[in-house]
Amino acid sequence: MAELKNDRYLRALLKQPVDATPVWMMRQAGRYLPEYKATRAQAGDFMSLCRNAELACEVTLQPLRRYKLDAAILFSDILTVPDAMGLGLYFEEGEGPRFERPTDTVDAIKKLCIPDPEDELGYVMRAVSTIRRELKGEVPLIGFSGSPWTLATYMVEGGSSKTFEKIKKMAYAEPAALHMLLDKLADSVILYLNAQVANGAQSLMIFDSWGGALSHHAYREFSLRYMQKIVDGLTRFADGRQVPVTLFTKGGGLWLESMAETGCDALGLDWTVDIGDARRRVGDKVALQGNMDPSMLYASPERIHQEVGQILSSYGKGTGHVFNLGHGIHQHVDPEHAGAFINSVHELSPQYHK
């Protein structure tokens, strides 16, 4: 495979010296870009886009043609793993993802099989290897998965939820059943992420989108415990270099110290946390990624520039910061404003690395 020309992102995650703060955006390949909309229309629907390695590669590369980004992230969905377990994933307009066969009983959980990443999830691996080849070493490729807790919320609820009533009922009334499900999911995610590394992913990220819905103790029991299991089982060295791992719990500001103890390399921060405060709390244990409010991209380029400066100043001098949004970019953001954000990071960050 081609030698990596820009390793700023990987170096920052490992707290090695960099010349500037690396930057990428969660959901950088997405609906805010007209070229993405055109490719998605060509594919027919979202999952057809995910399952076509060439088109998934095309949308992964689109934001890199527009912007000076320091990393590419695999174009896929966190729900590929439960879909491969046979739950029948489909998308309803305005409703988001749904499952034909929710996993809301002990019997349903017992019947679940751990998917083979090279078989049922082979389309993801083909996308990873295609993207890695087409990147030609320009920037590193990030592979990812949802966390066991987050995947379980969709599987038990049958889709998106605002209240998480069904899964919380299972957590408190039938905890053994939920632990069985989370254990199977953790084993599945370990295989899935290690297969991504084997096919060319150079960094890994675990998205715990709904960990913040849990109480203090329940988070440790039902979310963090299983992310810890995954971190322990991951391939951490490939292609002659370390494969950094980032954990991101949206709404997880309460648990940064505990997350940093898992052995991961970096923590993603949402916009509710002050990044300077987070740095003081975790010390030298982990790097930090984040954490501008995605809605700030609706502001003027001047205001975006100011906000970038404020976050850089809050983090302070030295490596260990990957600039990102605090969650995914919104679909109605002006692409020019996303460009202003990225350019501001490149312009303002070098002074913090002298």
Swiss-Prot record:
The keyword Iron does not apply. GO terms for molecular function: uroporphyrinogen decarboxylase activity. Substrate binds at residues 27-31, 77, 154, 209, 327. It catalyses: uroporphyrinogen III + 4 H(+) = coproporphyrinogen III + 4 CO2. Its main location: cytoplasm. The record marks 77 as: Transition state stabilizer. It is found in: Cytoplasm. GO terms for cellular component: cytosol. Belongs to the uroporphyrinogen decarboxylase family. PANTHER family: METHYLTETRAHYDROFOLATE:HOMOCYSTEINE METHYLTRANSFERASE RELATED (PTHR21091), UROPORPHYRINOGEN DECARBOXYLASE (PTHR21091:SF169). Homodimer. Catalyzes the decarboxylation of four acetate groups of uroporphyrinogen-III to yield coproporphyrinogen-III. This is Uroporphyrinogen decarboxylase.
